[in-house]
């Protein structure tokens, strides 16, 4: 196991501002502006979340006319073809003014980390062909689809020998209902969004994306707006699996009490696979030196090569370590594989560079 530690003294001070605790969907959706009752992250978690938000993938905006068929191309080279008349007001009428189309794409390990959108289902990693979100508005009012948007995406990772790629639904937001009374003391209810902890819960959708030999793209359709869709295939790993426990030497003890952002985090990037797994489970009742995270039980393939990224924000300072590793089998008489981390102080820019380096692993 080879440790790649990037360590330099912190030379940059970052001002802490109010952290946007909304998920990506909520930030794009003006109807989700009801404050959700949830635990508050600590100051270090806010500092880390602020950095991730500033360095993460950005929304791209396009102006179109609803009565015309139009194809827009993002800076990532992906094409979205909107049929004429496909965009409608919620009452079914056709928009008459210019339409703003907002598109967000999460495509690489760096994006997966900075957007808190790991590519895993029940802790098992998925080979990702990207995550996509589209919103359309007229004068600020959300529109709906009367016909699907055709999407052609550039294939940026290895192609598995299969005819179709499963589509997935998932988000960092869950919705719950509060029952109460309105201004006339009549029973009523309100549906409110809240950030889901822990993170994404990807569920397989009934449709698929198809490889297009003519264009060299992966093609699929979006039948709804304001909904994340993910193109993923199963990892296909076979053989024995283990539970990985990651021990942090620098750990923020407020991590179990901070939600949805956390001041300590652990990620695993499988070697040469466009995927990132986030370890959400916290080691409980740990003695000094053994605080940290563990994977789902018996989920990480023994012999899997990859890179861990351990991160902690503590007292306004960032600490991190990149660690290349091959997942070992549990020692005799145990049912887990331990990995110890030696986190070093890093600046904000150094941390972002370490996250970006996952794209090359």
Question: What feature does the model see in each segment?
Answer:
Residues 10-11, 22:
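A detector of low-complexity, intrinsically disordered, Ser/Thr/Gly/Pro/Ala-rich segments
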Residues 15-18:
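C-terminal motif of bacterial Sec signal peptides marking the signal peptidase cleavage site
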Residues 11-12, 70:
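Exposed boundary/loop context
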Residues 2-10:
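Sec-dependent signal peptide recognition
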Residues 22-79, 85-96, 104-111, 116-361:
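Proteolytic cleavage junctions
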């Amino acid at each position: 196991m080879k440790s790649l530690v990037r360590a330099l003294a912190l030379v940059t001070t970052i001002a802490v501002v109010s952290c946007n605790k909304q998920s990506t969907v909520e930030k794009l959706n003006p109807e989700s502006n009801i404050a959700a009752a949830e635990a508050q992250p600590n100051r270090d978690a806010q500092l880390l979340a602020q950095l991730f938000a500033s360095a993460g993938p950005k929304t791209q905006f396009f102006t179109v006319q609803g009565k015309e068929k139009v194809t827009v191309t993002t800076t990532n080279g992906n094409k979205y073809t909107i049929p004429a008349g496909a965009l409608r007001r919620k009452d079914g009428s056709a928009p008459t003014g210019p339409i703003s189309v907002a598109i967000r794409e999460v495509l690489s390990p760096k994006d997966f980390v900075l957007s808190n959108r790991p590519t895993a289902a029940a802790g098992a990693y998925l080979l990702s062909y990207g995550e996509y979100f589209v919103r359309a508005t007229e004068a600020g009012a959300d529109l709906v689809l009367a016909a699907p948007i055709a999407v052609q995406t550039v294939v940026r990772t290895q192609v598995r020998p299969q005819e179709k790629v499963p589509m997935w639904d998932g988000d960092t937001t869950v919705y719950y209902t509060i029952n109460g009374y309105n201004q006339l003391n009549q029973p009523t209810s309100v549906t409110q969004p809240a950030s889901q902890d822990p993170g994404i819960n990807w569920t397989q959708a009934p449709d698929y994306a198809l490889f297009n030999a003519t264009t060299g793209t992966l093609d699929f359709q979006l039948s709804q707006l304001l909904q994340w869709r993910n193109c993923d295939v199963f990892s296909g790993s076979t053989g024995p699996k283990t539970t990985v426990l990651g021990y942090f030497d620098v750990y923020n003890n407020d991590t179990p009490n901070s939600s949805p952002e956390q001041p300590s985090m652990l990620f695993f990037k499988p070697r040469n696979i466009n995927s990132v797994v986030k370890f959400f489970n916290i080691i409980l009742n740990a003695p000094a030196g053994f605080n940290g995270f563990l994977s789902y039980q018996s989920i990480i393939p023994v012999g899997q090569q990859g890179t861990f990224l351990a991160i902690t924000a503590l007292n306004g300072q960032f600490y991190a370590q990149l660690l290349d590793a091959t997942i070992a089998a549990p020692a005799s008489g145990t049912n887990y594989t331990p990995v110890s981390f030696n986190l070093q102080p890093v600046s904000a820019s150094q941390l972002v560079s370490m996250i970006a380096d996952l794209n090359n692993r």
